[in-house]
A protein has these predicted regions:
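Acidic, mature catalytic/reactive cores of soluble proteins
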Residues: 1-188
Length: 188
């Protein structure tokens, strides 16, 4: 990854978008996927934002794909017990392996996110998710998620808070060994 890919949020475009509040929250823009390289987008911004009638939101829509919610149509079934609802959520909250694009650091295996809005895995949240997966007998997914954390260790030297470039500067309490133990208890 280039320096700009690792930290695409230290530039005039990012500052303009976040300060203008064209999106309802600060997460939307940082999770957008660029349609071309950051360098080309910043070059276009530098040229276009000086023109009369420049529309920042339209510029962003022209140069980025907005994040798409994954589970918009999911509704829990209040007639089912809580455990049955949780079982039905695993597939809703599962994300497929990623391609490198935007702030999302690609992972090689499927993983479970903490909620429908999220497209990224979170470190210590994942341990508690794995406890639920263990109860559901989903050791395949536990193994996938451990594989992803192992991949992050190989790539970065540690496990960041989540697999977004804006999480690279921080981590969470160490749960990797406990994750491995969950799988070792089953597989030996």
């Amino acid at each position: 990854m280039t320096e700009l890919q690792l930290n695409p949020f230290s530039n005039p475009l990012f500052e303009a978008v976040q300060m203008s509040r064209i999106f309802p929250d600060g997460k939307t823009f940082v999770d957008c996927r660029p349609k071309q390289s950051y360098e080309k987008i910043l070059e276009a911004f530098h040229t276009e934002n000086k023109k009369p009638g420049f529309d920042l939101k339209q510029f962003v829509l022209n140069h980025f794909d907005l994040p798409v919610p994954h589970s918009v149509h999911y509704r829990s079934d209040t007639t089912k017990p809580v455990a049955a609802n949780i079982e039905s959520l695993w597939d809703v909250l599962t994300r497929k392996p990623d391609k490198e694009n935007g702030s999302l650091i690609p992972l090689p295996f499927p993983y479970v996110v903490p909620g429908g809005r999220f497209g990224e895995i979170y470190y210590w949240d994942s341990y508690f998710t794995m406890l639920g997966l263990k109860t559901s007998g989903r050791y395949d997914m536990i193994e996938n998620m451990i594989g992803n954390f192992s991949y992050l260790i190989d790539q970065l030297g540690y496990i960041p808070n989540g697999n977004r470039t804006y999480f690279i500067g921080r981590s969470q309490p160490p749960f990797y060994a406990q994750m491995i133990k969950l799988l070792a208890d089953k597989k030996g």
